[in-house]
């Protein structure tokens, strides 16, 4: 919860509300988002709870498609001068929004308009830093931050003769387990992954402490040259390409589609966002959680935040900004953060919520649920593991996905795919400067 600033205007308003009898119409605040399944249910639940907690403002959640589609819808709406009050933007879109000076109002400023003061010391450091300017100004509100983890099917492990209580820790162990699962018939597919860009390149770089690009992956300057064709990347993606030849690895799609390959029982292991937990639980599968795999001699270092944050456009009314500030304050309440964390798998963005969850013995009762937090907070970030910030990261991800798909389709090997991705990605980054 934010610190309330008591000002003359606030006190005057409070007195007016106390003595006045006029009925005020609710101010509706559209919240455009890209959440599906269990996470969409959580968006609706939190919106309803906020709406019932007061009578001045009404949050209206609107699903606008997947993450990239939601970002594009928000940009188009702003250009047509009809922006939503709140836009959920995925991690890759942060650079796009940060570059749009004048188009957005920093979350810290929105809070001040509502009479609140943002205190970054109340938040998990890695998360608040990711969505802030170098001077510490918070630009967006970290609603659903996540960390990639390994989910595995305990029943499939048991059938394949693997220890159901010991998930593989390194990538070679994952690949060997996947082969054994496929060969034994325990599952038709051994391993799959959502988000090959976010998990297998951006977080791969951070977790294994290797550069994604120059200039600290874009955090130290916008003139970035990609470095994702170095030997460790080539080794990793060639191993995945080899597993794809006989279906030991199965590709589900560019975003979160592969999650269904796991929840259906088709694939026995899945690397996916911690925020995918809700759908995994709903599937009823006998699952376990392991940390994100790494390569010996390189990792583990620290993961970088995924998920999304809430951005606010310029040009809204003062009343809208006050309502948004109230909603952000509501989302920051410890009980709300604990609920969001425990039900969805997303990280508790406040330290108070994290401490409250630990005190309740939740992590002891739910093994693996603290893993994504420990991955992010375990070590001080290096220049390779602070994050990735490109003004056109969604476009660069599309380029990488095209090359990965050609590789997985048997049209090129990993080195060719990564060399092509670097060449095309660098050209796109240069053109966006």
Curated annotation (Swiss-Prot):
Q: Which UniProt keywords apply?
A: Periplasm, Signal, Transport
Question: Where does this one sit in the cell?
Answer: Periplasm
On whether Transport is a keyword of this UniProt record, the answer is yes
Q: Which residues form the signal peptide?
A: 1-25
> Where does the protein principally reside?
periplasm
One GO cellular component term? periplasmic space
User: Transmembrane residues, as ranges?
Assistant: none
- Report what the protein is called: sn-glycerol-3-phosphate-binding periplasmic protein UgpB
| UniProt-annotated binding residues for sn-glycerol 3-phosphate | 67, 91, 146, 273, 307, 346, 397
Q: What does this protein do?
A: Part of the ABC transporter complex UgpBAEC involved in sn-glycerol-3-phosphate (G3P) import. Binds G3P.
Q: Which family does it belong to?
A: Belongs to the bacterial solute-binding protein 1 family.
Q: How does it assemble?
A: The complex is composed of two ATP-binding proteins (UgpC), two transmembrane proteins (UgpA and UgpE) and a solute-binding protein (UgpB).
One matching Pfam family, short form? Answer: SBP_bac_8
Q: Which domain of life is it from?
A: Bacteria
């Amino acid at each position: 919860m934010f610190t309330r600033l008591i000002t003359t205007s606030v006190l005057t308003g409070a007195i007016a509300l106390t003595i006045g009898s006029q009925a005020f119409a609710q101010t509706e605040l559209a919240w455009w988002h890209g959440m599906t399944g269990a996470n969409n249910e959580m968006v609706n639940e939190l919106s309803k709870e906020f709406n019932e907690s007061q009578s001045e403002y009404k949050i209206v959640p609107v699903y606008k498609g997947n993450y990239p589609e939601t970002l594009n819808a928000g940009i188009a709406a702003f250009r047509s001068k009809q922006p939503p009050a709140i836009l959920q933007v995925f991690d890759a879109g942060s650079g796009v929004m940060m570059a749009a000076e004048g188009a957005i109002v920093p979350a810290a400023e929105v809070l001040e308009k509502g009479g609140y003061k943002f205190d970054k010391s109340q938040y998990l450091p890695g998360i608040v830093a990711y969505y802030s300017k170098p001077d510490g100004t918070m630009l967006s509100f970290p609603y659903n931050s996540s960390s990639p983890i390994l989910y595995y099917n305990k029943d499939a492990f048991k059938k394949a003769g693997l220890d159901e209580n010991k998930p593989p820790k390194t990538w070679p162990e994952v690949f060997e387990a996947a082969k054994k699962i496929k060969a034994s018939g325990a599952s038709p597919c051994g391993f799959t992954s959502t988000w090959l860009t976010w998990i297998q390149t951006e977080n791969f770089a951070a977790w294994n402490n290797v550069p994604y690009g120059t200039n600290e992956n874009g955090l130290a300057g916008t003139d970035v040259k990609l470095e994702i064709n170095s030997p460790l990347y080539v080794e990793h993606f060639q191993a995945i390409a080899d597993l794809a030849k006989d279906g030991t690895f199965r590709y589900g799609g560019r975003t979160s589609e592969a999650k269904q390959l796991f929840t259906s029982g088709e694939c026995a292991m899945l690397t996916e966002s911690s925020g995918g937990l809700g759908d995994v639980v709903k599937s009823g599968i006998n699952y376990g959680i392991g940390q994100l795999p790494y390569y010996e001699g390189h990792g583990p270092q620290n993961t970088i935040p995924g998920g999304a944050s809430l951005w606010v456009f310029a040009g809204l009314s003062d009343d809208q900004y006050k309502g948004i500030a109230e909603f952000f304050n509501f989302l920051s309440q410890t009980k709300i953060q604990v609920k969001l964390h425990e039900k969805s798998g997303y990280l508790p963005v406040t330290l108070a919520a994290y401490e409250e969850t630990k005190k309740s013995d939740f992590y002891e009762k739910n093994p693996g649920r603290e893993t994504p937090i420990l991955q992010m907070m375990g070590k001080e970030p290096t220049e390779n593991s602070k994050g990735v910030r490109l003004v056109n990261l969604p476009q660069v991800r599309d380029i990488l996905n095209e090359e990965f798909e050609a590789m997985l389709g048997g049209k090129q090997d990993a080195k060719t795919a990564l060399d092509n991705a670097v060449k095309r990605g660098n050209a796109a980054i240069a053109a966006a400067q």
